[in-house]
Amino acid sequence: MAAITASMVAELRAKTDAPMMECKKALTEADGDLNKAEELLRVKLGNKASKAASRVTAEGVVASFIDGTTGVLVELNCETDFVSKNDDFLAFSAKVAELIAKQNPADVAALSALELDGVSVEATRTALIGKIGENLTIRRFVRYANGGKLVSYLHGTRIGVMVEFDGDEAAAKDVAMHVAAMKPVSLSAEQVPADLIAKERSIAEQKAAESGKPAEIAAKMVEGSVQKYLKEVSLFNQPFVKNDKQTVEQMLKAANTTVKGFTLYVVGEGIEKKQDDFAAEVAAQVAAAQKG
């Protein structure tokens, strides 16, 4: 059997970015043949990605990129908060954000097929899964390229906001921070999605019915609740987070600034996290051992 040297392991690691021990195992299995070892590693890393694909990814990061009037916000997910701080994962996220800005893919599938550092985004993602050992996914992104000014705000790496505006940049940055804190769903009350209004109206109707009030009063209660909700979730109507004596709309008017649109991403929003039941896990392991 050929001797496996440190330089051989280092060379294979440089080619595949795989963990050191995995490289040594592959070289041993390939009897020192570097090309064969590389092929073995590619297959192994791919198998790891396949096994990881079904695992829930509710942690992760939001990354942003702005170049002039082009801006991107992208959410990438992983399984644990620990990996969300991994340098390789963060570097991949930043590169993906920049690639979206430059190449303008239509969706995540198109993005995955684009080339990044000489290989496809999908191949890079798969290799990273093999290296880190967790499922990693690109969940969603938005790209602004309408010619307007842009600012972004990241609260750590878990909340990201992109704001398109005309006017004062400092005021726009304040709005981005406000959006991260108050989480509006639209610019104005008129733009609140119909399904959200219907859901709120249904809740209000149920409460009104339970109150036992006469129909006319109950109807007014429902309408009042809906109008209050619309003000609470529309950006322009919200009390400004840095000065609640004025609304965001009033603050923008005083700053001679117009907000044309915004996007808010919160990591894992809407993804059901897996709740581990330790007792059930132990019971399952005991049962499996007894069968064996």
Swiss-Prot record:
The keyword Transcription does not apply. GO terms for cellular component: cytoplasm. PROSITE patterns: EF_TS_2. Its main location: cytoplasm. InterPro entries: EF-Ts_dimer_sf (IPR036402), Transl_elong_EFTs/EF1B (IPR001816), Transl_elong_EFTs/EF1B_dimer (IPR014039), Transl_elong_Ts_CS (IPR018101), UBA-like_sf (IPR009060). Signal peptide: none annotated. The keyword Cytoplasm applies. It holds the Pfam family EF_TS. GO terms for molecular function: translation elongation factor activity. Belongs to the EF-Ts family. Associates with the EF-Tu.GDP complex and induces the exchange of GDP to GTP. It remains bound to the aminoacyl-tRNA.EF-Tu.GTP complex up to the GTP hydrolysis stage on the ribosome. This is Elongation factor Ts. The gene is tsf.
